[in-house]
Amino acid sequence: MIITSLLDTDLYKFTMMQVVLHHFPAATVEYRFRCRTRGVDLVPYIDEIRDEVRGLCALRFTDVELDYLRRMRFIKSDFVDFLALFHLNEKYISIMPSPKGNGEIDIVIEGPWLHTILFEIPVLAIVNEVYFRNTQREPDYREGRERLRDKIKLLGAKPEFADCKIADYGTRRRFSKVWHEEVALTLRDGLGPQFAGTSNVFYAMKHDLTPLGTMAHEYLQACQALGPRLRDSQTYGFEMWAKEYRGDLGIALSDVYGMDAFLNDFDMYFCKLFDGARHDSGDPFDWGERMLRHYEANRCDPRTKVLVFSDALDIPKVMQLYERFRGRCKLAFGVGTNLTNDLGYVPLQIVIKMVRCNGQPVAKLSDSPGKSMCDDKAYLAYLRQVFGIAQPVGDDASQ
């Protein structure tokens, strides 16, 4: 089986799941899969994907895994007790050929948020690995190792980048589980203190790495249906996060409604309360400059705040961003596909996004055209109107 542990996922799934347990236990949601890479035929692999998902749903947390989670300062004991009883249920996920007949597949995850939130990352990893083990039966790991060594050499060659740290954010789009583990260990051994850790909880536990993550888009999207008023949903999401974590895990995701809406909502209170913000779409250099100006305008010293960059990064881009912002703020970089799926093959651009919560459409209004995803055009238009956001050229989020 591809997934052999329920910890083989990203940390932010557990940090969000704890909020769901404590504040939104009755919420119901729907997620949908999309492959953004054109011309990819996934239909022949449906049976394999289903078999792997069936194996995923048979897994439970072990005592060792639960003890590991319990030792995290921000994980509460009642949440670990809940996880001791938890397993993913196959009845909440369906995997079918798309009626479009173009090689696409429809993966729909629908049910209680508390019982479906852990599907996304392992299912994406399953789709990726099933696809590549069928299309690349003799993987060119030699090429992958050479590319990885070049990245390590590039980052470690210049003394002025000694404080530039990267983290592995590559679980969902990794080439394979085996390759992902090799990448993480190679980064640990090759970069030393320049390797900040990994978003993958299983490898963090197994190899004594630092697990990293706070919140994802789905959390703030769900707040569109869970909060008191749509316009205040982002503020509501940040307030509920602070209510749960009391200042811990203080990295705010900035692009669910675009940068302008984020800055309008991220007032002096949030600037002081949260440790920093994460960039995941749009121009990262412009975003960073705007964040620094925003902190200064809200009487916060930017040098005490963390800017996290995680959008389609590679090592040269990391180094450019580090050169621009070093000394002006604290910096963190999460690199995904470019680390865990760079063996010379075209990686799949696949996502699973929340599209409904409590029967109501929810959406992400990204700073990057094509990254939004909503199956209700009327709601998307209404959401843009409420937040005063024009539709980016080339963005058809319902496709």
Swiss-Prot record:
Disulfide pairings: none
Record InterPro entries: N/Namide_PRibTrfase (IPR041525), NAPRTase_N (IPR040727), Nic_PRibTrfase (IPR006406), Nic_PRibTrfase-Fam (IPR007229), Nicotinate_pribotase-like_C (IPR036068)
A cellular component term, taken from the record's GO annotations: cytosol
Swiss-Prot/TrEMBL catalytic activity: nicotinate + 5-phospho-alpha-D-ribose 1-diphosphate + ATP + H2O = nicotinate beta-D-ribonucleotide + ADP + phosphate + diphosphate
Keywords linked to the UniProt accession: Ligase, Phosphoprotein, Pyridine nucleotide biosynthesis
UniProt record, GO biological process: NAD biosynthetic process via the salvage pathway
Post-translational modification: Transiently phosphorylated on a His residue during the reaction cycle. Phosphorylation strongly increases the affinity for substrates and increases the rate of nicotinate D-ribonucleotide production. Dephosphorylation regenerates the low-affinity form of the enzyme, leading to product release.
GO terms, molecular function: nicotinate phosphoribosyltransferase activity
Phosphohistidine modifications at: 217
Recorded metabolic or biological pathway in which this protein acts: Cofactor biosynthesis; NAD(+) biosynthesis; nicotinate D-ribonucleotide from nicotinate: step 1/1
Enzymatic class: ligase
Function per UniProt: Catalyzes the synthesis of beta-nicotinate D-ribonucleotide from nicotinate and 5-phospho-D-ribose 1-phosphate at the expense of ATP.
The protein's name in its UniProt record: Nicotinate phosphoribosyltransferase
